[in-house]
Amino acid sequence: MSLEDSLRSLSLDYLNLLINGQAFSDVTFSVEGRLVHAHRCILAARSLFFRKFFCGGSDPSASSGLIDQTGIRVNPSGSPRSSNGVLVIPVNSVGYEVFLLLLQFLYSGQVSIVPQKHEARPNCGERGCWHTHCSSAVDLALDTLAAARYFGVEQLALLTQKQLASMVEKASIEDVMKVLLASRKQDMQQLWTTCSHLVAKSGLPPEVLAKHLPIEIVAKIEELRLKSSIARRSMMPHHHHHHHQHDLNAAADLEDQKIRRMRRALDSSDVELVKLMVMGEGLNLDEALALHYAVENCSREVVKALLELGAADVNYPAGPAGKTPLHIAAEMVSPDMVAVLLDHHADPNVRTVDNVTPLDILRTLTSDFLFKGAIPGLTHIEPNKLRLCLELVQSAALVLSREEGNANNNPPSSTTTTLPMYHHPMNDDHNSSSSSGNNHNIANLNLDSRLVYLNLGATVGSGQMSDDHGGRHGDPAMYHHSHHDY
C-alpha cells in the first residue's frame, strides 16, 4: 500500500467515526435543533478553538456550554443531556450544514464545499441547477469560510478561499460584490484583488455600486479603474498610435462587458435579454461561446431556448481544442443536454483538433467505467445516464450515416425520405408512444455497443463493481466538470 493509499484509508476511518454518530462519542452538539455526536480528542487535536474550549475546566461539565456568535462559552444550569448521558452543547454561531462540513474536514482533512447538484436550495430558484457558482453555492462557501475562521481551522479557510476565487469568475456581479465585502472584512487580500478587478470591469457606474457597497469601497473601485486606464495609456509606444490603441482597448472592454452581461442573463434564465443583446447590440453568440457556457452551466430549458433563437451555431468549435457543445455535453454525461443538442442538428461525428468525436468520448468513459471501476477525472457517475448518452449519440451517428449512404446511392432526381436525426424517448409526453422508435434504434446498434450496454447494466445491477477500498457501493450523483479546455 502506497503512502497516499494509507492516508486515504486513515481519512476514511476517521470520517466513519463521525458518520456512525454515537459510536464512542463523548461530546454532543445541538445545532438548529439537531444533535451532532463527536469526539473531543479529535476536535481538540485538529482545532485550537476546541482545544481551549474543552480545557476550560477540570470538571467535565465545565467544558459544556453555549458556543454563541461572540465565541463566549456559557454554562447554563440544567444543560440537557443526550441519550448516552453526554452533556449537549448548543451551537448558535453556525448552521447545521456548515457545522457538518467543518466537522467533516476536521475528521478527514477533505471536504466538498459545494451543494448537492440539482438539490432544491432556498436562494436558488433555477430548477436543475448544478450549484457550481450560483448564489446558493457562493453563500455556502462564504458561510463555511466564516466558520473556518471562527473555529480556527486555517486549512479549511484557505481551501474555501480558493473555491471562492474559482466561483467568482463565473458568478453574477451581485455575488462577486458579496465576496468582495467578505474578503475585505476578513482581510483576504488575494480574494479582494480578484473581486475588485471583476467589479471594476463590470462597467457598473458608481451610483449603482453605491447601492450594494460602502462608499469607501466604491471609491477604491473607481481608483482601480483610473489606474487601469492610465496604465493602458502608458503602454502605448508612440503618440500617433494613441487613439487607435485606445479604441481597441475600449472595444475589447465593451465586448468583455457584453459577455459578462450575457452570462448573467443565462444564469438567471433570461434568454429574452440575450435576444435583445443579439438584435440591438450585435452580440455574436458563437464568439461569446454562449452555447458552450449554457450547456456547461445552465438548464436544458435555457439551452433549448438559446438554440431556438437561431443565432448560434450548434456545431461551433471553441478554443484551441475545437470542442463543440456536444463534446461538452458528452464529457458531462448529461442525457438532457445531449438530447436537446441532437434535436437541433448537432453533428455526432464532428471532431476536435485531436480528432476526437463526442462518440469517442462516451465510448472511452464507458470502457474506463467497465474495466477500471471508476472514471479518471470524475468522482461519481450514473451508469444509466452514461448508457443513455451513448445510445443517443450512437443512434444519431447511425441515422446520419444511413442518410449519407442513401444520398450517395440514389440519383439526384430521385425522391428519398429523410429520416429524423434520431429518436429520443425523453422528449415524448408518453413513453408508450415511443416504444416502437426505441426498439428500432436499439435494433440498429452494432453488436459491440450492445455488449457494452449489457455489461454496464449487468455490472451495476449485480453489485460486482468494486474499487480499491473493498467494493463500496452507493447511488452516486453525476459529477460535473466545472472547467473545460475550450
Curated annotation (Swiss-Prot):
The lineage of its organism: Eukaryota, Viridiplantae, Streptophyta, Embryophyta, Tracheophyta. It comes from Lupinus angustifolius. It is found in: Nucleus; Cytoplasm; Cell membrane. Keywords: ANK repeat, Cell membrane, Cytoplasm, Membrane, Metal-binding, Nodulation, Nucleus, Repeat, Ubl conjugation pathway, Zinc, Zinc-finger. Zn(2+) binds at C124, C129, H131, C134. GO terms for biological process: induced systemic resistance, jasmonic acid mediated signaling pathway; nodulation; plant organ development; regulation of DNA-templated transcription. The keyword Cytoplasm applies. Homodimer. The BTB/POZ domain mediates the interaction with some component of ubiquitin ligase complexes. May act as a substrate-specific adapter of an E3 ubiquitin-protein ligase complex (CUL3-RBX1-BTB) which mediates the ubiquitination and subsequent proteasomal degradation of target proteins. Transcriptional co-regulator involved in the promotion of leaf and floral meristem fate and determinacy. Necessary for the development of stipules at the base of petioles. Required for the abscission of senescent organs, probably by regulating the cell wall disorganization in abscission zones (AZs, e.g. pulvini at the base of leaves). Promotes slightly root-cap border cells separation from the root tip. This is BTB/POZ domain and ankyrin repeat-containing protein NBCL. Belongs to the plant 'ANKYRIN-BTB/POZ' family. 'NOOT-BOP-COCH-like' (NBCL) subfamily. CDD domains: BTB_POZ_NPR_plant.
